A protein has these predicted regions:
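Class I SAM-dependent methyltransferase Rossmann-like catalytic core
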Residues: 1-99
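Class I SAM-dependent methyltransferase SAM/SAH-binding core
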Residues: 99-144
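Short, aromatic/basic amphipathic alpha-helical patches
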Residues: 112-120, 194-204
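A short acidic, Gly/Pro-enriched loop at the edge of an enzyme's catalytic core
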Residues: 137-154, 167
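Short catalytic micro-motifs in class I SAM-dependent methyltransferases
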Residues: 155-159
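A short glycine-rich, Lys/Arg-flanked "PGG" loop and its adjoining helix->strand segment in the class I
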Residues: 164-182
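Core SAM-dependent methyltransferase catalytic element
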Residues: 199-230
Length: 230
C-alpha cells in the first residue's frame, strides 16, 4: 500500500514539475507587454493601460505656453484690471511715470508687474520667495539683493504676510531713493492699525491712507515718502 502511495506521489511530483516547466517556457517565449513595438496594431477594446507602454505620455508644456494659458484666464484678467486701476490712481498723484524704477515686493504670480508694464513703466522688478518667470524673480523680501536707493518706488500688497514686518519694511525703505515712495496695501483697517504700520517705517514720513478695493477685497493703501538718506 505504501509503495502505491509513493508511486502516486512521485507521478504527481513529475506532473507538477512538467507543468511548471511548461509555464516558465511559455512566459520566457512570450513578448513582455512593456516591449510591444510602437507599430503594433491598436487595441481599442482596452480602456485602461496595462503597462507603461500602453499609457498615453503626458504632454510637457513650456513656460511660455503655461504662462499664456494662465494669463488668459478670467481670474488673471480680473486681478490685472484691478491692479491697473490701482496704479492709475498712483499715476494721477504724480508717483508713477514711464521712467519710474519700481520694485514690487512679494509680487506673487506677478499681476502688479504686468499691470505696471502695460501702463508703460519701463523698469519694473518683481520679487518673491518663489519665482514666476518672466514676471517675478526669486528673492527674500527680508533680505533684498539690491543696492541702497536703487528704486524710485517700492510697492507691496503682502506686508501682512511677512514673517518679520519691521525687517520687511526696512528693506523696502533701504532700496528706495530719498524722496521716493513706499506704498503698502493691507486689509482695510482703522486709524490705530494705520499708525502701527506707519511706525514700522523709520526713514519715511506718512503722507496719507486711503481705503481702496484691490482684487475684489476691501483694502487700505498707505503712502509713505522717503526722507532720510541713511
Amino acid at each position: 500500500m505504501e509503495r502505491h502511495v509513493r508511486l502516486f506521489l512521485n507521478k504527481l511530483s513529475f506532473a507538477s514539475i512538467a507543468i511548471a516547466s511548461l509555464i516558465l517556457l511559455l512566459l520566457f517565449l512570450q513578448t513582455p507587454q512593456t516591449c510591444i513595438p510602437p507599430n503594433s496594431p491598436p487595441k481599442p477594446h482596452l480602456k485602461f493601460p496595462k503597462s507603461s507602454c500602453d499609457s498615453t505620455p503626458r504632454q510637457i508644456l513650456s513656460v511660455d505656453k503655461k504662462n499664456k494659458r494662465l494669463w488668459s484666464t478670467k481670474h488673471w484678467q480680473n486681478n490685472l484690471s484691478s491692479f491697473l486701476n490701482f496704479f492709475h490712481a498712483l499715476r494721477d498723484l504724480g508717483l508713477l511715470h514711464n521712467h519710474t524704477k519700481v520694485l514690487c515686493v512679494s509680487a506673487g504670480a506677478g499681476h502688479e508687474v504686468m499691470a505696471l508694464s502695460q501702463m508703460g513703466v519701463l523698469d519694473v522688478t518683481g520679487v518673491e520667495l518663489v519665482d514666476s518667470p518672466p514676471l517675478v524673480t526669486r528673492a527674500d523680501p527680508h533680505n533684498l539683493p539690491f543696492f541702497d536707493h536703487a528704486f524710485d518706488l517700492a510697492f507691496s500688497a503682502h506686508l501682512a504676510e511677512a514673517l518679520f514686518p519691521s525687517r520687511f519694511v526696512s528693506e523696502m525703505e533701504r532700496t528706495v531713493r530719498p524722496f521716493g515712495s513706499c506704498v503698502v496695501v493691507v486689509e482695510e483697517c482703522g486709524d490705530d492699525e494705520v499708525r502701527e504700520i506707519v511706525g514700522l517705517f523709520t526713514k519715511s514720513r506718512f503722507v496719507n491712507s486711503v481705503n481702496v478695493t484691490l482684487t475684489g477685497l476691501k483694502m487700505t493703501r498707505i503712502l509713505m515718502k522717503r526722507v532720510s538718506s541713511r
